[in-house]
């Protein structure tokens, strides 16, 4: 019999519809974050020291620091991290930052300086390790914990350093002429722009300042006019020949021209080209072949050319004409008169080569290097008088000083590629040759050669990940520190000082704190569900420091670019002002060492596709022909079609199969993780797919997670990489399981000194950043064998290791009494009764007892004027019990605050002295439940300041925690003992002993029975003859003792932390945190959605018996509006409905077969049915080889509905859907007859019914509904505040006022504008009137009117209100009364 495969039932098996085999492994989805930060910190120093990158590079760039006189120097040696004080969970609980102390070893060198010669000799060297603040560490999930909350540092997209050529698209000048410009962007330092103006003069700008002619810049680099012309133009020599001139024949400059006069060969005198003839390339080639070397020219043919060198009389030194002068009658006369018969001429023909640099040189007022340097100095530092030294130093510091200017390796690589240079990427400053190459290329662009750059190409944009952002921030901190160190080194007696006396690490620590706390890229992690966590970590933002701003970003930056293919998702981006500026990394993409995004491709060798995978960036990919992942192939890997659809240089085209070099790895490499989770994405309109991707991130984890029937195969990947489901770190056997932890005895990776036990703590009812509930449930049972990577426990929104954001619901597409108008959703009461869409939310309330001026606040049960009934949930310490059910207004923590003393009468003083304290000294400031929240207390934490006596509740919590730690220690100890003593007895068995415990007969052979007579602790006393075994025994003993002491030490450390007081904000004596779990059932007003952007609000919940039902009596759960599909073009939801219907139909069949098996014991029909469903695709499970137990486990998993995977762009097609429906015994129209639940009548026509995966989104009506009668008012305007958080009112705005004005509702309007809003006196009067039962009131002046008057007065306008009373006769004479 074939070897049976077993299936443990701990993972979900899916029927796979994908036809394209996946050759590349999908990289870990949060690798972007982890790899970047690891490279920055390099915690473990490698052998041979750390390379110059990350933190090491920062220290190397700032150190050594020399004092102003050069008498001492502070050098950097190395750095190391100490273990963090608190682990991740402790930091979360205590609101601390998870960080490790950074220790830097510095060396202070003091020199002796010889006063006469200035020679230095080393006088003293001191080395010391200095504490440089705490460096935040990344958790295993790629997040940081800052002040107790999880944060994510989002990667930033910015323009890559390097050189860019561009033009203004004809916008600057009215003629629409294209003005070309080049810009050299360094990583840090001054920007250099070189640009044309409308007159074709070339200018340079430094740091966007005033422009100077580019020739001045070149002169400042040490060139003179003639050298500049030599660099940019070719020279030719015109010789005098009789009356005319002999000029060289250069065919390359004459292409396409027309001969105005006849062309004569200077050597033979024959006419080679007639006047008026066009010079075709063929004709020019013929002339060259004939041996034409030079042409004859008259004087006027020379006019308009430019001299290539000075015309000098060498005997007298007189310069007649300078290089660059134009040749005309006058200048030619001077040349001939002085007897020159050879003229050097610049090769400028105004067609292929323009005279731009020559014209600039002529227009430039600066003659030499000094003038040019002074000019640049005046531009950069206006108002300062320049000297040669200061100008030279300033110019050098701009581009040629590594401290001030850094192109970075990326910039140098980009520059080399663009300008065809070959310079090492360690050369990080500009060179003269670089500037010349930039100017040369710019001039060539103006001459019509070459292309401008596309700045939105991903080859020109790079990603700055956490590590790099942190590196820049830390460098800023160190530079601030450097100034202070220099000053201190100069002002202090250096001989007696140690390095730590010079260093104040506060600026560096502050820079780090500022970055994590308030940078735009450090964001509060989106933790609604595992998918939102992963997407947040893979996000790319173009905003942030050094990036774009929303207002300035145009359409081009936001648009999808051809280079996004396989790198950035074209679908997932927010709707709204940030659209296109915040993107998501594609599934297979990764970031290379230079920060460019790379995508994987399969190599094609000799026309055959191999499994060899190659990662390329956008720049490298442009030169290849890349076939699509779904191109049809033969079995040997060659293409079926003669012409293949491919991409090349940003275009999609058909090309012959022989020209293909690469092929895409997978169809889903185009999209991001969220988009890859949408089945039938290819059938959805892009706008709706965008909404679908974004809404999956808002799905609330439900009470019972259920994986989708119709998935895409990405679900386990997301669950695993997000860290929501717990995977085994190494193989082993499950030793213990309960709801809070799993203990596994490892069977692999057993190194000496490494614990042989893995304890996995499960999170129970923890609060996430968005108040959703994080809860993990074990999937394994005692005795299970697990392999590395197996799923041990499900987390929030996961089901058997698959991401499960919602529930499968039976949906009918039909109208129902108008309750699904405008995308509303009609639900059955069954969904509420069975808690299908019920979720748990956890609210955190904290209360602090402070030390006030009038005395300390106190947390107590003894609260004045509160009934015993209100205190029923509090313990003797005044803190609510765990498990108490609370509702709005209930006290959670009782607290009293001392009241300000009012002066006392002598009688009161006497009474006080006699009867002691009076209850009126304190007021009740207890924490109560806010309005509208009901729930159950799930956790209470009490924090005490050092030295403050702990109350009974704090002690109880502490005892519980210590018991838990002791249990962990004891379990690990028990497994260790079992392992070690097991190995010990194995070693001793059959050995001849030479010593043993008291009363043992030496020399006898040891056996299990003999050894077992003695207590375990005495087994170590046995010694054996065999020396090898004896030494192994001793090694085992050493290892055992070491492990045991390590365990005990770890336990003691943890206990010490628990017992120690907590660090509190100043003035706080005690803090209590209370966590309340709120169960939210679905109700009208909650927002729901499918995965295809089909969102809606629940409009009504109908009794089950009134819902439409199928022929077998099953009532549908959800009724959706069929009109929501056609105009939105998200047909994927209909295909999902059909396929889900087929899955449920097959699940029903499998359920029936299970019942049959229970009756007759024959499992083969079940095995055959499941085998037929799974099929035989590339990823199909071998069900026919499963043992019987495994078949039953799989059948049990599938009886509610078969799970299938239809990957994006490679999923089930129409035929597959029809086959599945037939296999399930259903109609292939996918429609069913429905009956009205209220009348029992059949509906007129067939209705599409099936299963859709529905999500409940984090927009719950409970969080939004809000009512106010009286509440807080704004300080200045005295108007009610707005919003639920402020307990605000409803704004009656400008337009609403217009509406009342239009109706002439004067009294209503008056109320709205005065007593209901900001008439302070009127408000109280109305209240008093209502209390009296009187309904008359008088409106006064609104406060906002006073604000207006004050504002006008502040502008110098005296505004007075006249208070005059008129009688009726006077009133009648007013102008508007007469009309």
UniProtKB/Swiss-Prot annotation:
CDD domains: RNA_pol_B_RPB2. Its EC number is 2.7.7.6. Keywords: DNA-directed RNA polymerase, Nucleotidyltransferase, Transcription, Transferase. GO terms for biological process: DNA-templated transcription. The RNAP catalytic core consists of 2 alpha, 1 beta, 1 beta' and 1 omega subunit. When a sigma factor is associated with the core the holoenzyme is formed, which can initiate transcription. The lineage of its organism: Bacteria, Pseudomonadati, Pseudomonadota, Alphaproteobacteria, Hyphomicrobiales. This is DNA-directed RNA polymerase subunit beta. It catalyses: RNA(n) + a ribonucleoside 5'-triphosphate = RNA(n+1) + diphosphate. One of its GO terms (molecular function) is DNA binding. One of its GO terms (cellular component) is DNA-directed RNA polymerase complex. PROSITE patterns: RNA_POL_BETA (PS01166). It comes from Rhizobium johnstonii (strain DSM 114642 / LMG 32736 / 3841) (Rhizobium leguminosarum bv. viciae). InterPro entries: DNA-dir_RNA_pol_bsu_ext_1_sf, DNA-dir_RNA_pol_bsu_external_1, DNA-dir_RNA_pol_su2, DNA-dir_RNAP_su2_dom, DNA-dir_RNAP_su2_hyb_sf, RNA_pol_bsu_bac, RNA_pol_bsu_CS, RNA_pol_bsu_protrusion. DNA-dependent RNA polymerase catalyzes the transcription of DNA into RNA using the four ribonucleoside triphosphates as substrates. It holds the Pfam family RNA_pol_Rpb2_45. Belongs to the RNA polymerase beta chain family. It comes from the Bacteria.
């Amino acid at each position: 019999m074939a070897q049976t495969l077993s299936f443990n039932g701990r993972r979900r098996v899916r029927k796979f519809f994908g036809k394209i085999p996946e050759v590349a492994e999908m990289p870990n989805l949060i690798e972007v974050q982890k790899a970047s930060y690891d490279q920055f910190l390099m915690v473990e120093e490698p052998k041979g020291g750390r390379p110059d990158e990350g933190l090491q590079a920062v220290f190397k760039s700032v150190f050594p620091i020399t004092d102003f006189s050069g008498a001492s120097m502070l050098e950097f040696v190395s750095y190391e991290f100490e273990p963090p004080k608190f682990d991740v969970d402790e930091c979360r609980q205590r609101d601390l930052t998870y960080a490790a102390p950074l220790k830097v070893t510095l060396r202070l060198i003091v020199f002796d300086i010889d006063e006469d010669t200035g020679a230095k000799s080393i006088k003293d060297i001191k080395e010391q390790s200095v504490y440089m603040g705490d460096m935040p560490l990344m958790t295993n999930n790629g997040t940081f914990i800052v002040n107790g909350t999880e944060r994510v540092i989002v990667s930033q997209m910015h323009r890559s350093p390097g050189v860019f050529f561009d033009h203004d698209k004809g916008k600057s000048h009215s003629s629409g002429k294209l003005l070309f410009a080049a810009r050299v962007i360094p990583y840090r330092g001054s920007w250099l722009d070189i640009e044309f103006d409308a007159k074709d003069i070339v200018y340079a700008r430094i740091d966007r300042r005033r422009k100077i002619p580019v020739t001045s810049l070149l002169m400042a680099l040490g060139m003179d006019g003639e050298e500049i012309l030599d660099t940019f133009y070719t020279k030719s020599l015109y010789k005098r020949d009789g009356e005319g001139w002999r000029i060289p024949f250069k065919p390359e400059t004459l292409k396409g021209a027309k001969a105005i006069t006849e062309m004569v060969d200077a050597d033979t005198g024959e006419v080679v080209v007639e006047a008026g003839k066009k010079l075709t390339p063929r004709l020019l080639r013929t002339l060259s072949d004939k041996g034409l070397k030079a042409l004859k020219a008259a004087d006027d043919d020379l006019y308009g050319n430019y001299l290539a060198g000075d015309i000098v009389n060498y005997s007298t030194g007189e310069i007649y004409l300078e290089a660059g002068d134009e040749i005309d009658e006058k200048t030619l006369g001077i040349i001939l008169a002085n007897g020159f018969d050879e003229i050097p001429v610049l090769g400028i023909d105004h067609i292929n080569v323009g005279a731009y640099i020559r014209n600039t040189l002529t227009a430039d007022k600066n003659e030499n290097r000094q003038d040019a340097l002074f000019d640049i100095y005046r531009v950069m530092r206006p108002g300062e008088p320049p000297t040669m030294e200061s100008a030279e130093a300033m110019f050098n510091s701009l581009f040629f000083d590594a401290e001030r200017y850094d192109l970075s390796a990326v910039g140098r690589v980009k520059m080399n590629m663009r300008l065809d240079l070959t310079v090492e990427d360690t050369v990080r400053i500009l060179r003269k040759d670089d500037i010349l190459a930039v100017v040369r290329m710019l001039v060539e662009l103006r001459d019509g050669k070459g292309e401008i750059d596309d700045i939105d190409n991903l080859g020109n944009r790079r990603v700055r990940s956490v590590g790099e952002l942190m590196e820049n921030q830390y460098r800023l901190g160190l530079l601030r520190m450097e100034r202070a160190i220099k000053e201190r080194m100069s002002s202090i007696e250096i001989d007696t000082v140690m390095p730590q006396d010079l260093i104040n690490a506060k600026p560096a620590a502050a820079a780090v704190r500022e970055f994590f706390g308030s940078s735009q890229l450090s964001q509060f992690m989106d933790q609604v569900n595992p998918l939102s966590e992963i997407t947040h970590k893979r996000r790319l933002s173009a905003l942030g420091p050094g990036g774009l701003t929303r207002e300035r970003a145009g359409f081009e930056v936001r648009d999808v670019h051809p280079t996004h293919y396989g790198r950035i998702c074209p679908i997932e981006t927010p709707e709204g002002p940030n659209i296109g500026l915040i993107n998501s990394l594609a599934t297979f993409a990764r970031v290379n060492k230079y920060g460019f995004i790379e995508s994987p491709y399969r190599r094609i060798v000799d026309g055959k596709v191999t499994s060899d995978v190659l990662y390329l960036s956008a720049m490298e990919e442009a030169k290849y022909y890349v076939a699509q992942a779904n191109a049809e192939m033969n079995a040997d890997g060659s293409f079926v079609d003669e012409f293949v659809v491919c991409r090349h240089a940003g275009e999609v085209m058909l090309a012959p199969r022989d020209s293909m070099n690469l092929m895409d790895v997978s169809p889903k490499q185009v999209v991001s993780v969220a988009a890859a989770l949408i089945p039938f994405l290819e059938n959805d309109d892009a706008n709706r797919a965008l909404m679908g991707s974004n809404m999956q991130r808002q799905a609330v984890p439900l009470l019972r997670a259920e994986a989708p029937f119709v998935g895409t195969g990405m679900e386990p990947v997301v669950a695993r990489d997000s860290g929501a489901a717990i995977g085994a770190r190494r193989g082993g056997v499950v030793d213990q399981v309960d709801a809070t932890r799993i203990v596994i005895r490892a069977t692999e990776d057993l190194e000496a000194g490494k614990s042989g036990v893995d304890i996995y703590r499960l999170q129970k009812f923890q609060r996430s950043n968005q108040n959703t509930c994080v809860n993990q449930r074990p999937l394994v049972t005692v005795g299970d064998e697990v392999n590395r990577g197996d799923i041990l426990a499900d987390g929030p929104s996961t089901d058997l290791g698959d991401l499960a954001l919602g529930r499968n619901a039976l949906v009918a597409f039909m109208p129902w009494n108008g309750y699904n108008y405008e995308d509303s959703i009609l639900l059955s009461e069954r969904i509420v009764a069975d808690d299908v869409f019920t979720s748990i939310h956890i609210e955190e309330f904290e209360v602090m007892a402070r030390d006030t001026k009038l005395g300390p606040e106190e947390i107590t049960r003894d609260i004045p004027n509160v009934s015993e009934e209100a205190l029923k949930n509090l313990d003797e310490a005044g803190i609510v019990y765990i498990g108490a059910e609370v509702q709005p207004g209930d006290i959670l923590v009782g607290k009293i605050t001392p009241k300000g003393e009012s002066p006392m009468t002598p009688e009161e003083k006497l009474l006080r002295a006699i009867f002691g304290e009076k209850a009126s000294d304190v007021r009740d400031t207890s924490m109560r439940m806010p309005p509208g929240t009901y729930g159950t207390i799930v956790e209470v934490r009490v924090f005490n300041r050092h030295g403050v006596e702990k109350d009974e509740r704090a002690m109880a919590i502490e005892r519980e925690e210590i018991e838990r730690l002791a249990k962990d220690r004891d379990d690990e100890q028990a497994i260790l003992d079992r392992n070690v003593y097991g190995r010990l007895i194995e070693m001793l068995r059959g050995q001849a002993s030479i010593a043993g415990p008291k009363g043992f007969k030496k020399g006898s052979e040891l056996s299990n029975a003999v050894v077992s007579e003695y207590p375990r602790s005495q087994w170590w006393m046995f010694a054996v003859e065999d020396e090898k075994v004896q030494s192994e025994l001793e090694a085992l003993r050493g290892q055992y003792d070491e492990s045991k002491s390590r365990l005990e030490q770890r336990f003691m450390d943890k206990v010490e932390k628990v017992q120690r007081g907590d660090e509190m904000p100043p003035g706080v004596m005690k803090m209590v945190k209370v966590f309340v779990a709120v169960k939210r059932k679905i109700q009208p007003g909650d927002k729901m959605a499918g995965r295809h952007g089909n969102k809606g609000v629940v409009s009504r919940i109908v009794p089950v018996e009134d819902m439409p039902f199928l022929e077998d009596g099953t009532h549908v759960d959800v009724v959706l509006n069929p009109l929501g599909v056609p105009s939105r073009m998200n047909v994927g939801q209909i295909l999902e409905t059909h396929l889900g219907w087929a899955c449920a139909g097959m699940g029903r069949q499998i359920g029936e077969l299970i019942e049959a098996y229970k009756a007759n014991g024959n499992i083969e029909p079940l095995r055959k049915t499941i085998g037929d469903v799974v099929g035989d695709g590339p990823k199909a499970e071998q069900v026919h080889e499963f043992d019987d137990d495994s078949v039953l486990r799989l059948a049990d998993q599938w009886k509610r509905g078969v799970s299938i995977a239809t990957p994006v762009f490679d999923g089930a097609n129409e035929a597959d859907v029809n086959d599945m429906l037939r296999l399930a015994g259903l109609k292939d129209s996918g429609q069913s007859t429905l009956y009205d639940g209220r009348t029992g009548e059949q509906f007129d026509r067939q209705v599409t019914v099936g299963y859709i995966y529905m999500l409940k989104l984090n927009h719950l009506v409970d969080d939004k509904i809000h009512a106010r009668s009286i509440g807080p008012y704004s300080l200045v305007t005295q108007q009610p505040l707005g919003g639920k958080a402020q307990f605000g009112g409803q704004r009656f705005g400008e337009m609403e006022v217009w509406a009342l004005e239009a109706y002439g509702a004067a009294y209503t309007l008056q109320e709205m504008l005065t007593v209901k809003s900001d008439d302070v006196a009127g408000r109280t009067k109305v209240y008093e009137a209502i209390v009296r039962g009187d309904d008359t009131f008088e409106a006064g002046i609104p406060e906002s009117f006073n604000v207006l008057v004050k504002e006008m007065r502040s502008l110098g306008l005296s505004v007075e209100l006249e208070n005059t009373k008129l009688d009726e006769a006077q009133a009648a004479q007013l102008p508007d009364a007469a009309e």
